[in-house]
Each structure stands twice: as C-alpha cells, then as structure tokens.
A protein has these predicted regions:
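Aromatic-anchored transmembrane helix interface
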Residues: 76-88, 98-123, 133-142
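Hydrophobic transmembrane alpha-helices and their immediate junctions
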Residues: 135, 140, 211, 242-249, ...
C-alpha cells in the first residue's frame, strides 16, 4: 500500500507529465506533426492552413482547464478578449454585407482559436522550472522540424519529389516544375520565435543543455536562410539577435564580448549586404512580381477601405472566379492581405484592429522594460523587435504567424510576471 505522501507525489508527477504532454502536442501540431503525417484535405494543403492547430488549441485549452481546475489569464487577456469580440461582430458583417455562408465564415475563424493557447501555456508556466521545460520542448521541436524541412529541400532540389505533406505554390507545380525550391510559409511562424528561444538559452550561460540550444539555433538559422529564403525575414532575425546579445551582455563588456560583436557584425554584413542590395533592386524595379503586387495591393485597398473602415473586408476569401473574389483580391487576383503587413490588417480587419495591433507592440515593449532578469529581458526585447520590424511586411495576424503572436505574448507575460514576483518576494 502506498502512503498518502507517496500517492500525492505520484499524482503530482502524473499531473506534471499531462501538462507537459499538452504543450508538446500543441507545438508539434502547428507543423501538422512535422508535415510527416498525411491529414485530410480540410487540414492539409498549404502551410498557412491552420485549421488543424486551431482545433488542437481548443482541445488543449479544455484539457488543461480540466486538469488544473484553473486558467491563468495574464496581462494580455483584455486584448485577446477584444479580438474575439471583434471577430464575432465582423462575422455578422460578412454574413449580411457579402452574403457569405455561415459555415464558411465560422470555419475560416477556426485558426484564431490558437489564442486559447495563450491561456493554456500561461497556466503551464507557473515557475522557472516549467519555463525551462517549455524552452527545451521548443528546442527539440525546432531540431526535428528543421531537419525535416532541410532534408525536404535537398531532396526536392535534386529529385523534385515531396515527401512532406504540404502543397507548393503554382509557381513550382505549374510554371517552373524543374526549379529549385524555396518553401515560403513553412518556417514563417514557429521558427521565427524558436530561433530566439534557442539564442536565449545560449546566452543563459549554463553549460548543461547548451549543446541542444546551439543545435536548435543553427538548424533554425539554416531553415530561415535556405528553406524560407525571405530577405526581410533574414534581416529581421539578424537585427533581433543582435539586440538580444547587446541587452544580455550589458554591463559585461570585455574583450571577449567586443570580439564577439565584431565577428557578429562581420557575419551580419556578409549576409545582409546582398539582401539589402536585393531589396533595393526590387524596390527600384517596379516590374518585379512581388514588389508590383505589394505596392499595387496597398494602393488598391487604400482606395476604398474608407467604406469599410471599422469592419475591414473580412477574413474570408471567396472561391476563385467569383466577382467577390476579384473584389477582395483585385482584378488580377494577385493581391494578398498577408503580403503588406499592417496595411493588410487595415484592409482585412479595419482601423480598430490596426490600433489593437499597435497596442500589442507597445505593450510588448512596456512589459519588456519592466523585466529585471537580464537574459529574460533580452528575450522579451528580441521578441518585441522581431514583431516590430515586420510591421510593414509580416503581420502576426496572418494565419502562418498567429503562433508567433501567441508565443510572443506568452513568453513576455511570463518574464514580466516572474520579475514582479521577485520584486514582491525580495
């Protein structure tokens, strides 16, 4: 027979493992289990299809609430609740203004259930130990995901064969079947946060587990450079990492730090100069496809968004070929909300959510300033800078980057809460 104390310890271990499993399930579900498992069409296809992770987030939220009998709301709760109220109201507008079907509108909102994971992860992160476990889970997930994506890139470039379960754009499948691949979107959301988490653990100084952090970091960087290949994304990452390093090493400037900064600056220069030149060439070339579409989209949406200022055009994109599709996507069907940052937020969700988005960024920085732990402050600022630098090109309200926003809110909230607890306990 087990004593009461032994039963209590046994239940505690089971309780802890259950919570850990819930978080692990969420992390691997974002990439649809590293894109290895074939899922029904409703959940599969392009990497930006976040229907599956939305439903998993709902399940994880309910499961965590049942297991813990509580939910920690944190410092972003009012912003998240406002977003949900807005989406509910916007759904009514879409229904009666554009005559979309109720099922289409509601189905399109499923990815936003991902914000429930803010509460779920907050409930899991109740102390420093749980945060270390969370970071370790992120690192292992990053290692497996990055290896899968890098191997897929290698195989595709050599054999033009996809073994992972995501759909490539028409550029590859229809027009340039033998072209070398770049898999835009598959690394847009989770990896951009994971690379900062890995760098945070490298900066932390503890040798234990640093090998995992370094492996995760290098693989994530390789993923961003070789798999995603977005010039702006690479620049965002370098800037965020640079500021993280400066903040973490504040008051510790010595010869080693100066040498590291010099080496970092040299490597960054080698990486960034071609990217800057490429961006400048693109901006100067009005006939460049992506540049033409982005500038055209901004002018197009701004020309009439005043008529939809408080509601936006909505999140639902009608079927191609319909008049409503070409109204949303432009006459050529080439304009996208997710290509134009906050202009896309304004076009799709209106002025209220544009203000909401800016308030989130401001809150990120305000909370980051309050954090006392140097390395946690560096991580919080890295997350804040990553979001800020993508303001005109990569909105965190786009489907593939919703997880970036959820993890940014969650991590900054935890670090700020820990600092507040330490102040009171001190």
């Amino acid at each position: 027979m087990l004593s009461d104390n032994q039963l209590y310890e046994q239940n505690n271990k089971l309780f802890g493992k259950t919570k850990l499993f819930i978080i692990a399930l969420f992390l691997v579900a974002d990439s649809r289990f590293f894109y290895l498992l074939p899922l029904p069409d409703i959940f599969g296809g392009v990497a930006s299809n976040k229907t599956f992770i939305g439903l998993v987030s709902l399940i994880c939220f309910i499961w965590m609430a049942l297991v813990t009998k509580k939910i920690n709301v944190g410092k972003y709760v009012n912003l998240i609740l406002f977003l949900y109220v807005f989406l509910f109201c916007q759904a009514f507008f879409e229904k009666y203004r554009f005559q979309y079907s109720t099922s289409s509108i509601l189905f399109n909102l499923i990815p936003f259930l991902l914000f429930l994971m803010y509460f779920t992860i907050n409930t899991f992160l109740d102390d420093k130990k749980s945060f270390k476990l969370f970071c370790l889970l992120c690192e292992w997930t990053t290692i497996f995901l990055s290896i899968c994506l890098l191997l897929q890139l290698l195989v595709y470039n050599k054999m033009h064969f996809l073994f992972l379960n995501f759909t490539l754009s028409d550029w590859y499948t229809k027009y340039h079947v033998t072209a070398s691949g770049r898999f835009a979107g598959v690394s847009e959301g989770y990896i951009r946060i994971a690379v900062l988490i890995s760098f945070f653990n490298i900066l932390n100084g503890s040798r234990k587990g640093k090998g995992i952090a370094i492996s995760s970091f290098l693989l994530a960087i390789s993923d961003i450079i070789f798999v995603d290949q977005s010039r702006v994304y690479i620049i965002q990452t370098v800037i965020s990492l640079f500021f993280m390093y400066l903040i973490a090493k504040k008051n510790k400037i010595n010869v080693n730090v100066i040498l590291t900064i010099i080496i970092f600056a040299m490597l960054a220069t080698v990486i960034l100069i071609p990217k800057f030149n490429s961006i400048i060439d693109t901006l100067n070339n009005s006939s460049d496809g992506s540049n033409y579409a982005r500038i055209g989209a901004i002018y197009y949406y701004l020309s009439f968004i005043g008529n939809y200022l408080f509601t936006g055009l909505g999140e639902y994109i009608p079927d191609e070929g319909t008049s409503q599709y070409y109204f949303i996507k432009g006459g050529q069907g080439i304009y996208n909300f997710d290509d134009i940052g906050i202009f896309g937020v304004l076009a799709s969700m209106g002025i209220l959510i544009l203000i909401w988005y800016l308030l989130v960024i401001i809150k990120n920085f305000r909370l980051s300033f309050l954090i006392k732990d140097r390395n946690e402050k560096a991580l919080a600022f890295g997350l804040s800078i990553m979001m800020l630098t993508g303001i005109f090109t990569a909105s965190y309200l786009d489907r593939e980057r919703l997880i970036s926003l959820v993890l940014t809110m969650t991590i900054i909230n935890f670090c700020a809460r820990e600092s507040n607890l330490n102040i009171h306990h001190g």
